[in-house]
């Protein structure tokens, strides 16, 4: 994962207008990166079955039963599953992960383990294996202790008892807290934990050598006379993290005293405002509105959505809503919604939410709409992700044609309608708590019907936007957009279209290359070359 990837947030239920807990994340990596939304069925595993992460070779024994769960995976499992977010059948929800990294001093003492636990496999291991959020934290802690972590990560995992915020800091060090109900947090790609009270075992889970490793690394730091986790483990704060945490805090609490150039930012914040689901959506769509800064992506960018070197301007900052967002999700967790239904709703925006709607889904759904399951790595009008990607690309490339914001306005109108409908659906799920099968069927039917109607409208919006561009710039402008999208994958093999011709071609090329290498080595030896060259 690049440094500029993913922004998470938590809003405790005592800060919300309706008493729900809000937890979410934008999943950021790169443009033109297809994502799916699926239901993974309960599986009775064979004895001795092993999970292997194709991304790095990490292995873990599968439990006797892998519980049913929803997931938002990548479409290239040979590069890692990246299930990312979902509910399991026991009402545990997870968002994993926000990438982060320890400083060089820490990594020399407790380095990351190449085949350790990584984001690519984390959700696929944890969510189908646990019945409570605490069990999930304890499972991750055990794995990191025994097998190590391949990278630093921040994870949120929740159930009816609350939300756990966990930082996997280095190869074998971690810390987690039960998040306070009267606080909110915004966290991009850096660690934020401060003083951790390890004596409070009900609300804290931490590795025993957390302080020891920092001292050995000579990076141990205190604040107010107490060991400070993030100050001890973090590298210097990156500009892309500063801009997102600052703008995120100000989005939720405009009167917050935080300043852009503060030396560091705390994890926990409070506000006199009563926050709503709309506030959470606005946070994930935030592009530095109301500040003196402008989004970096308004500058000329490279293929990763990053400004070209040497063209950085202090006015331009990296926003939460940026071209690298592949999907965004918000868990709206309510005390009264049964755990069997997930304990709440996951509002999912497939593709960047900048011009895309969030749709609500319970954790007990049995299937997802087909457009969420299209596997291609190239543009397809059958795909939810690619449809949204095309709409966002058109709006970004031709802002003068879409400056009225009509698409975003329509998305927000639909969301507001669904929020009202979802309150009624909550009551239905509560009434069906003793009939879980009927509740699942009801949730699935509602989700499918809404998705089908919405996708049809998104197709109309896409066609209208394409026509608007073609009328102004000609049909060649649309072909240019196709070429730009294809260029992002020109070196990748499309798994959907993969066939044995590729294998044969690769084999012939490999054999030819091997023959050339052998010939050169033999020739070199005959000319007196060193045997160990």
Regions found by a protein language model. Give the residues of each.
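C-terminal membrane-anchoring or membrane-association module
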Residues: 515-533
């Amino acid at each position: 994962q690049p440094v500029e990837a993913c922004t998470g947030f938590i809003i405790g239920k005592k800060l919300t207008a309706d008493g729900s807990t809000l937890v979410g994340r934008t999943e950021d990596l790169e443009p033109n990166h297809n994502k799916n939304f699926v239901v993974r069925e309960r599986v009775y595993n064979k004895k001795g079955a092993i999970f292997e992460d194709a991304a790095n070779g990490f292995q873990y024994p599968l439990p006797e039963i892998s519980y049913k769960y929803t997931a938002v995976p990548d479409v290239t499992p040979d590069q890692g599953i990246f299930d990312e977010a979902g509910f399991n059948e026991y009402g545990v929800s997870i968002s994993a992960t926000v990438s982060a990294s320890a400083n060089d001093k820490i990594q020399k003492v407790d380095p990351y383990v190449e085949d350790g636990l990584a984001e690519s496999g984390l959700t696929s291991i944890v969510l189908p294996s646990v019945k409570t959020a605490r069990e999930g934290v304890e499972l991750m802690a055990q794995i990191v202790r025994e097998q190590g972590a391949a990278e630093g990560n921040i994870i949120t995992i929740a159930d009816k008892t609350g939300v756990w915020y966990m930082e996997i800091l280095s190869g074998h060090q971690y810390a987690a807290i039960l998040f306070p109900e009267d606080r909110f947090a915004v966290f991009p790609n850096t660690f934020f934990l401060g003083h951790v009270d390890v004596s409070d075992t009900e609300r804290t889970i931490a590795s025993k050598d957390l302080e020891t490793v920092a001292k050995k690394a000579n990076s141990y730091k205190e604040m107010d006379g107490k060991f400070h986790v993030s100050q001890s483990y973090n590298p210097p704060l990156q500009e892309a993290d500063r801009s997102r945490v600052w703008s995120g805090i100000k989005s939720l609490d405009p009167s917050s005293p935080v300043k852009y150039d503060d030396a560091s930012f705390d994890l926990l914040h409070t506000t006199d405002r009563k926050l709503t689901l709309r506030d959470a959506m606005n946070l994930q769509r935030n592009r530095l509105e109301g500040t003196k800064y402008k989004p970096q992506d308004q500058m000329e960018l490279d293929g990763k959505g990053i400004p070209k070197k040497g063209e950085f301007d202090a006015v331009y900052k990296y926003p939460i809503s940026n071209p690298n967002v592949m999907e965004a999700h918000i868990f709206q967790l309510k005390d009264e919604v049964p755990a069997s239904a997930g304990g709440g709703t996951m509002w999912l925006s497939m593709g960047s939410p900048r011009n895309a709607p969030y749709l609500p889904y319970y954790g007990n759904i049995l299937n997802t709409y087909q457009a969420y399951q299209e596997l291609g790595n190239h543009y397809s009008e059958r795909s939810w992700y690619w449809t949204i990607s095309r709409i966002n690309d058109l709006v970004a490339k031709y802002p003068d044609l879409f400056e009225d914001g009509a698409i975003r306005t329509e998305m927000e109108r639909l969301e507001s309608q669904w929020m009202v409908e979802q309150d009624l659906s909550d009551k239905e799920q509560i009434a069906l708590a003793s009939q879980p099968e009927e509740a699942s069927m009801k949730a699935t039917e509602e989700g499918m019907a809404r998705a089908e109607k919405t996708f049809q409208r998104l197709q109309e919006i896409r066609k209208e936007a394409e026509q608007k561009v073609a009328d102004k710039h000609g049909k060649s402008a649309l072909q240019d957009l196709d070429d730009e999208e294809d260029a992002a994958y020109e070196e990748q093999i499309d798994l959907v279209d993969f066939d044995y011709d590729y294998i044969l071609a690769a084999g012939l090329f490999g054999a030819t290359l091997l023959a050339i290498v052998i010939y050169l080595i033999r020739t070199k030896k005959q000319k007196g070359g060193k045997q160990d060259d």
